[in-house]
């Protein structure tokens, strides 16, 4: 059986790459998302945490991509 697994590190790399490709600084993204500090963005980019679904939708709009372009999902086999 295959189960979907989010690759947090690759998702973070996608966020960082898409952000820099569009010339958006972490500070700019922080302001666009209404965050008081950039810590969450840095944690996303390092693959430590994932954005909430609301923040993921906002990122997709800001970066002008689909959510699929941000979130890296792989299917892994389970032992069943």
Where in the sequence are the language-model features?
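A short, Lys/Arg-rich alpha-helix, primarily the initiator
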Residues: 1-22
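Short, basic-rich loop-to-helix N-cap that marks the start of a DNA-contacting helix
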Residues: 47-61, 77-79
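The alpha-helix within a helix-turn-helix
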Residues: 19, 30, 60
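Residue-level detection of the helix-turn-helix DNA-binding "recognition helix"
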Residues: 20, 34, 46-48, 75
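Short, charged recognition helix plus adjacent turn
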Residues: 1-5, 61, 69-80
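Residues within the helices of the helix-turn-helix
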Residues: 16, 27, 57
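Short alpha-helical DNA-recognition segment
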Residues: 23-43
């Amino acid at each position: 059986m295959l189960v979907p697994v989010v690759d947090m590190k690759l998702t973070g790399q996608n966020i960082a790459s898409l952000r820099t490709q569009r010339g958006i600084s972490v500070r700019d993204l922080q302001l666009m998302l209404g965050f008081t500090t950039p810590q969450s963005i840095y944690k996303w980019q390092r693959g430590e945490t994932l954005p909430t679904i609301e923040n993921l939708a906002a990122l997709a709009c800001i970066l002008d991509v689909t959510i699929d372009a941000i979130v890296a999902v792989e299917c892994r086999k389970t032992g069943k």
